[in-house]
């Protein structure tokens, strides 16, 4: 982590003598560090030159300073890797992902376990129900997601928007799942489903790269030549992203049913513009003696 130390000298007269003073400016934090603090205000309160500070007073390194291969980065992701390793691009313009570009899949396990729960029992204790659209028009079902970071509120907002768009119903009603304490298949890394902050929508109308290559997905040559596929309307993607969720359909190793709450990878929500209630005064007409420059041109 690089930071800059700025010093300036101010000279003035006091009792006829020149005085000097030096002011030390705080280290400039990495943009990713600030975005983490901005995205998770319930848990993070500040930073040092290379640490984020949690509200419980503990700190966590941002950049471990190590040069890693891609596999090493996946297995020992630090926060700097999480924020800068692969950039997630929001929006409904989706180009075919480049080889091995899976933005959002570098996850600092220590960070998420501290936030959402370090054990299955702890993560499960933070689950709450939300109302989600069901198969029959006008009906609903209950699904369980974490209350940490207000994920339940954000996902409820998604559900409300989806319910108001019946043409999207078949894609979202028969969900693939939310909370499931498990590792990602073939790895020792925990799935974001372990924390109740991810949802898989209807798998019938979605694609997953391993399902499309069931017989031969472990062959390197197949993985190097994946053909991106997607049946999920981008209207659904736009709704999820607006509420802080990223989409697995933007990965080279596509998982188009998958959404997870990752607000740190998305632009911060725009604050509503508050219109002034101050009554505007009527401008006075320029007097006959006013300068010509004060009138209309």
Question: Which stretches of residues belong to each language-model region?
Answer:
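Sec-dependent signal peptide recognition
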Residues: 1-7
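Hydrophobic h-region of N-terminal signal peptides that target proteins for export
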Residues: 8-17
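Cell-envelope/glycan interface and biosynthesis
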Residues: 25-34, 38-251
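A cross-kingdom marker for long, charged
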Residues: 242-280, 284-285
């Amino acid at each position: 982590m690089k930071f800059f130390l700025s010093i300036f000298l101010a000279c003035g007269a006091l009792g006829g003598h020149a005085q000097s003073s030096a002011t030390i400016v705080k280290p400039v934090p990495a943009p990713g560090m600030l975005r983490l603090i901005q995205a998770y205000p319930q848990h993070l309160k500040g930073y040092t030159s290379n640490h984020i500070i949690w509200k419980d007073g503990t700190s966590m390194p941002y950049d471990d300073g190590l040069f890693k291969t891609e596999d090493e980065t996946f297995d020992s992701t630090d926060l700097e890797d999480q924020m800068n390793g692969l950039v997630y691009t929001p929006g409904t313009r989706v180009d075919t992902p480049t080889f091995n570009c899976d933005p959002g899949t570098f996850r600092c396990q220590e960070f998420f376990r501290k936030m959402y729960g370090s054990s299955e029992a702890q993560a499960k204790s933070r689950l709450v129900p939300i109302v989600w659209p069901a198969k029959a028009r006008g009906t609903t079902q209950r699904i369980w997601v974490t209350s940490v970071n207000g994920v339940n509120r954000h996902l409820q907002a998604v559900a409300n928007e989806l319910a108001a768009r019946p043409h999207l119903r078949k894609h979202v009603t028969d969900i693939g799942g939310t909370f499931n304490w498990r590792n990602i298949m073939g790895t020792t890394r925990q799935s974001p489903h372990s924390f109740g902050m991810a949802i898989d929508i209807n798998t019938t109308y979605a694609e997953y790269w391993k399902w499309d290559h069931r017989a031969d997905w472990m062959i390197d040559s197949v993985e190097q030549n994946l053909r991106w596929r997607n049946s999920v309307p981008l209207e659904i993607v736009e709704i999820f992203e607006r509420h802080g969720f990223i989409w697995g359909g933007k990965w080279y190793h596509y998982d188009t049913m998958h959404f997870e709450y990752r607000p740190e990878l998305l632009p911060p929500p725009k604050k509503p513009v508050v219109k002034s209630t101050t009554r505007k005064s009527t401008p006075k007409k320029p007097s006959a003696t006013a300068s010509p420059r004060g009138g209309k041109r």
